[in-house]
Amino acid sequence: MVRAQETVYDLITKCSVRRVPPKQFVNFYNEFFNERYDSVLENGNPAGESRPTAPVYEEVAQDLVRILNDSRVNLVADYVLEIVLINLNVDLLRLFLPKLHHVRNVMLLVHLFSRATAFISGLDNKLLAEQISDTVYTDVTPAVLSFNMQAIDDQLVIVLAKFLHAVLRLPEGQQKMGSVPTKQKAATLLQRLSTIDRLLYKRFIADLDGKLRLSGAPADMSFPLPPSNMPSPSVTSPKYETSSVGVMKRSTSMSNEAKYQDIKLARYYKNLWLNNKIHYCTVSDPLFLEKYDSILELATGGGLSADRPVKAKIADLVETAFTCFAQFVSNKLYHQSNSNFSLLERKWTVFVTKQLPLIIKSSIPDKTDIVLRTLENIDDKVIKAIKSYNTEKEEVKNRTEDLFDDYPVNSLDIRHEFLKNLIMMGLQPPTVLNEYLREDQMVDLKSLVTSEHLIIDNSQGVRETILNVRNFITKSIESLEFENLFDDGNQLLVTNDHGIIQIAHNLETISPTKQLEIANILYDLLSAAIESLDHKTISKVLTILTLNVGHLLTNIFCLTGYEKFARAVIRFIDVIWESNKSKSNDMVSDDSEFENINSAMAYTLSLCFIIHVVDIYGVNVEALVENPSKSTVLRFLSKLGEIPEVFVAPEGDLESSKTLLQQWLRELFVKNLISDNLMKSADVKVMGFMIPFIFKQTLLNVEYGIISDISSFVNGFEYFLQPFLSVGLINIVFWLEKYLLALKTTESFPKINGALFDILGAIIAPKSIGSDAKAIHSVVLKLKCVGLLKELKSFQVPSESNYGIYSSQTRQDPRLEALISKLELIAQSSALYDVDPRIISAVNNNYSQKHISYNKVVLTSDIPINKIMTNQINSFWNLHSSTYYNFDYLLELIDLVTPFKFVQDVFQTLKYKVTAYGVPGSATKPSSAALDQVLGYVFYFMVLRDIKCPEEKSLLLEYLDSGRFPSSISATVLTSDPTTISGMPPVSMPYDVKSEQDAMEGVDEDFDMLFGESFSGLPDDVQKSADMKPDTGIKEDDSEKSSYVSAARLTESFGVIFSKMKKDKLEAYQAGQISEERYQCFMGLYDKYVQTLRHSVI
């Protein structure tokens, strides 16, 4: 029962501390309200008449106003919005709104009205819209106009106007405005708005004229016109810029330059935001187009462009997309020869060719003529950059040993692929391709796919149209057999004509709508299989996805985001598997043998999938688990690459673990035969830790000379490839990379190299392997093939020079050669990203060439990190905004130098250069405004790196205001240690684990070091348990889910760095160590960052 003295104020306070999601808060509120006030309502009216609600809602309204004044947590405003407007309570709304002008907390008021505006704008519930519209003239408008329009903050003026702009569209017809004071307040609001936001002013006064009759206003009260000299910011790119009489009248070059910089900054913000959304696979956001179009506010301080025609928005997006892509590939081609990035390029290709057509179809399906006009108006420099990039790619693809060998040049580029997809979707006629190509190249129209239908080649070689895609995919997965996926050498068959494999290899010819449908079908199949424990289907789907056949997984993540797939697989291991573990352990009959194998495969492949999406796509797993303190996934990943000196089974004690270990050692290496009972009772979760322990101890004993005859061990290791034991291979390959790196520096290697290669051959390049084990073996090796290749190739011995001529030919142990060949084949058959192209190329060029790099950014004596940073900062100073567009490159660079040093170097150098030389290309002399101009680009990049979702934005702003995170958010101390700085370090990063107990207590900390980065761009529904860290943490509540934000992500942000620098600068200033001018200079930078963060579009 609720105690009598508890109030709504108390409820909101407690829920905000716990970070309870707004939707869940409503349930708590309803329960609280029923228990707290039902008796009051009933007792107040025993006659059974209508219940007296006014006193009750008056008390609730006062509590809401009080909490809005007292709290600094944006979540509180979300709660208020839920119970007043979203779950509409007209009685409460009529009592609450008139009290809002008493709230002095501007931050929460702005957040409240912003969220309310977004809700009203997207309202599609007709009944609710009618109910709200009934209150617009009688309650909402008078309440909003009751604010002191002369005294309130500019930002609050804007959000109030936007809110009224949205709600006045709900009712039909005109309504006479109430009293003269109300009209005067409306006039005051318009007066303020005309000096703050001209575009919004024009739309708002149109609303008042159309919805409210103003003819009865006093004669001396006239609605102000906007200042004629107020610039009207461009709503799109420079090509779509509209002229303004006021702008034309400005004759000074400084005004023209300021306008040009506004246009340039607006375009830059759009481009960088677009790169950010593509990089983090969040283009599938339903509000993508609206958010993109609202970025203008951030750059110019102008009003919303919500009233702009959808055609204009699409035209702007198409033009910006191709311009941004051209700048991206041009910068990559000419300025980043020292890097090996390819994943973002692939995502960009998917966005332009597949996602952009989907956005067009959902927005203007019948008005796509604007798209072709936009393409034709693209700047010639953009077209030239795209053509140059396409030519370079074709040359690399067709390059041969013969210098005189000619090859056909394909003049089709990404623009034409974009048009082909529009043609597939019926948004353009086939003839448009040749019309657009004109002099470039003619295309046989009969060869074009002009239908959205899925078309495949059946087993008879006949092209077949698939009408029921779901049924086709389902049957394709059911009939898929692992032995048909791989050849005798355990290599993935590229020429496989099986349904789902054929689809994966022909994604370019499949329409965007069908690709999205296929992605959703695969998710549905995976989810259904997880819920029903269909281990075979889970294994098949995850094998195809983890191997990324034909870049299928990348396309799926681009189209749908990665959160739902990752969350489903994590739930399988943490929840479904654990809840059915006892049943699995009881399966010891002969009939259960195959089911045990299937379940072990599903478990192992699920872990591999999770590791793969974290390592390649930067998925923040910690934000997706339901119960961090009990998560098997978190525990496994936090120890990835670490094998303890003493084996203790999960959920077991030392003695029982010792007995189990001895039993397996006897079966593996003495009897060389695993009994049926031991096989059937094997717990795959335990095997994941025991098998790596056995492997490590064997290698160490061989290295120390304790074991000399390895034949029995080699034979025993062959069992590690069996599906029920292969889970141990995961930790083995991650630990092995570090072990080989350390082994090179020891004196024991020459003595044991033969034995070492024999042992490695048993698990990496076995002579034979079962059909069921092929899939797991290939998937596990893919996770670390590049790292293992790097270390194994370092054992190669270069041959002596031949007559003074250098040769890269090597003489090596044939067993080592077999290991390297196997890993090279794995790399070549896998869709790997961000690696040297020669690693994944089947072409073997034995001529002298530069060394293969195994890092994303190549650092040499000729190109050290200092030189790279100098070039990057010079690009910032030159306002070469395209240098920001290679988001992946910049993130890696920041990780290399650490965020703190990046901030220091960038700001110190930029301040010096701008002060000494001004801004390149500017006609004006260096000024304080020049530094702001340069930093406008830098700050927006920093903000987009810092925050991935609205929750992180709110929490970071709270931290900057109060100097601390809420007690419910687990926060770690900011460090300059590069292993804990933003970006996802390799999953093989070594840890300092002192004991098994220490590791258990530090699961969360270790995991943040590995996977602290979050790229989801979406709210994370999970809570962190308080018992994972003794100092800080979230209170555990198994029954609830909450929006979870990784502490490591926030503490590694530039915002936290600025906050700590602010504190240090203030202490230094107060101690007289720095001048007031220097302190104020820093505070200007700090305020600029906070302002950019506060107004940023996520």
UniProtKB/Swiss-Prot annotation:
This is Mediator of RNA polymerase II transcription subunit 5. It is found in: Nucleus. One of its GO terms (molecular function) is transcription coregulator activity. Residues 1021-1041 have a biased composition (Basic and acidic residues). Component of the Mediator complex. One of its GO terms (biological process) is RNA polymerase II preinitiation complex assembly. Belongs to the Mediator complex subunit 5 family. It comes from Eremothecium gossypii (strain ATCC 10895 / CBS 109.51 / FGSC 9923 / NRRL Y-1056) (Yeast). Keywords: Activator, Nucleus, Transcription, Transcription regulation.
